[in-house]
């Protein structure tokens, strides 16, 4: 089910404050956040946001085609390394 259009998109308050502060100063710094559920809004374009994936922060440069998506979509949390070569347990 999609998010209602009547409601505003969710953006964490502390993240929004940091972005507004950098926009006023016209500075470009890496913003560190744990808020994977925040929606990307147009004022974030051009900033680099380091998103936590459970282990480390991955820096993501925000571009205009990312608007409307969640931050967590761009920082994968799982690493699939493939199945073992000689694993025949499932064939029994």
Swiss-Prot record:
Gene3D superfamilies listed in its UniProt record: 30s Ribosomal Protein S19, Chain A (3.30.860.10)
Any one Gene Ontology cellular component term annotated for this protein: mitochondrial small ribosomal subunit
Highest taxon, organism lineage: Eukaryota
GO biological process, one term: ribosomal small subunit assembly
PROSITE patterns linked to this entry: RIBOSOMAL_S19
Molecular functions (GO terms): rRNA binding; structural constituent of ribosome
Amino-acid biosynthesis among keywords: no
Key words of the record: Plastid, Ribonucleoprotein, Ribosomal protein, RNA-binding, rRNA-binding
Subcellular location: Plastid
Family, as annotated: Belongs to the universal ribosomal protein uS19 family.
Protein function: Protein S19 forms a complex with S13 that binds strongly to the 16S ribosomal RNA.
NCBIfam families in the cross-refs: rpsS_bact (TIGR01050)
Protein name: Small ribosomal subunit protein uS19c
Organism expressing this protein natively: Cuscuta obtusiflora (Peruvian dodder)
């Amino acid at each position: 089910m999609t998010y209602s259009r009547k409601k505003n998109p969710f953006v964490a308050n502390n993240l929004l404050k940091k972005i507004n502060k950098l926009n006023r100063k016209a500075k470009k710094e890496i913003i560190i956040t744990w808020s994977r559920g925040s929606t990307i809004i147009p004022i974030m374009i051009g900033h680099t946001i380091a998103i936590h994936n459970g282990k480390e922060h991955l820096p993501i440069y925000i571009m205009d085609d990312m608007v409307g998506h969640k931050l967590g979509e761009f920082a994968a949390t799982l690493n699939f390394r493939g199945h073992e070569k000689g694993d025949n347990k499932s064939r029994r």
